[in-house]
Amino acid sequence: MLDSIKIRLQYLLPKQGLTRLAGWGADKQAGWLTQLVIKAFARYYKVNMQEAQDPEFSAYRTFNEFFVRPLRAGARPVVAEENLLAQPADGAISQLGTIHDGQILQAKGHDYSVEALLAGNYMLAAEFQNGQFVTTYLAPRDYHRVHMPCDGVLREMIYVPGDLFSVNPLTAANVPNLFARNERVICIFDTTFGPMAQILVGATIVGSIETVWAGTITPPREGVIRRWTYPQAGAEGAITLEKGQEMGRFKLGSTVINLFAEGKVYLAPQLNSGSVTRMGEVLAEAVPVTPPC
């Protein structure tokens, strides 16, 4: 009964308004009030401040500064072997596995299409047909910067407006097409083992999604799909990111989805739904093909 009420509220609440309000408040320098909120949040969610570059609450002028706090050097060693992909974020794996007939598993009994996730781009979706996917959920207590699983050259970025449903196991099991409905930023990279998608999915009170090459992507929320393309590897202005390098961040929230082409990676066998992830640990083993182009 309680779960039914929570899901019903997801449809009734003014999610856009709540998100704007949360984003506004999280970016304000409110002195003692900001410190009170940060300390209460850290205690409630058991945030490990000893991993932070600056463990003192007083170092953070706004809640957003605290939320996207960098980690101290060496806190997340990145797997060194060239053929191994690294976890992109701290969190927990929601689902992972093979993309069957263009469908991704959201939760037991719920699938959604890769084409819908990729904003209806059927040509892009075809690149990941029968490939592999990994969905990583970032809890409030987690480190909220997102990193590269491997070296890659940025091919394109797509901003997709959408709903702002909360993302958690309850909504994943009860809101159809959750990740294909929510606001998201799709980043497509060319790698030595083929294309890779890294998708940052928004949620209720996720005030901002940012990338290191373009800054804040949302807000503003203009309600239209936006697309950016970038030079190929070796061309002037090409954007190349290395394994373990930061590529984006959430203020606040949410979820990272990775897509890989068929036969190009083998997901680490120890991973399953519910596995806790730490950025830099092994995600998969790559099967090299050709240099990115």
Curated annotation (Swiss-Prot):
It is a peripheral membrane protein. GO terms for biological process: phosphatidylethanolamine biosynthetic process. The active site is at D90, H147, S254. Binds 1 pyruvoyl group covalently per subunit. The keyword Lipid metabolism applies. Transmembrane segments: none annotated. Disulfide bonds: none annotated. The record marks G253, S254 as: Cleavage (non-hydrolytic). Its cofactor is pyruvate. Pathway: Phospholipid metabolism; phosphatidylethanolamine biosynthesis; phosphatidylethanolamine from CDP-diacylglycerol: step 2/2. It catalyses: a 1,2-diacyl-sn-glycero-3-phospho-L-serine + H(+) = a 1,2-diacyl-sn-glycero-3-phosphoethanolamine + CO2. Keywords: Cell membrane, Decarboxylase, Lipid biosynthesis, Lipid metabolism, Lyase, Membrane, Phospholipid biosynthesis, Phospholipid metabolism, Pyruvate, Zymogen. GO terms for molecular function: phosphatidylserine decarboxylase activity. InterPro entries: PS_Dcarbxylase, PSD-B, PSD_type1_pro. It comes from the Bacteria. GO terms for cellular component: plasma membrane. The modification Pyruvic acid (Ser) is found at S254. It is found in: Cell membrane. Is synthesized initially as an inactive proenzyme. Formation of the active enzyme involves a self-maturation process in which the active site pyruvoyl group is generated from an internal serine residue via an autocatalytic post-translational modification. Two non-identical subunits are generated from the proenzyme in this reaction, and the pyruvate is formed at the N-terminus of the alpha chain, which is derived from the carboxyl end of the proenzyme. Its EC number is 4.1.1.65. HAMAP family: PS_decarb_PSD_B_type1. Catalyzes the formation of phosphatidylethanolamine (PtdEtn) from phosphatidylserine (PtdSer). NCBIfam families: PS_decarb (TIGR00163). Belongs to the phosphatidylserine decarboxylase family. PSD-B subfamily. Prokaryotic type I sub-subfamily. PANTHER family: PHOSPHATIDYLSERINE DECARBOXYLASE, PHOSPHATIDYLSERINE DECARBOXYLASE PROENZYME, MITOCHONDRIAL. This is Phosphatidylserine decarboxylase proenzyme.
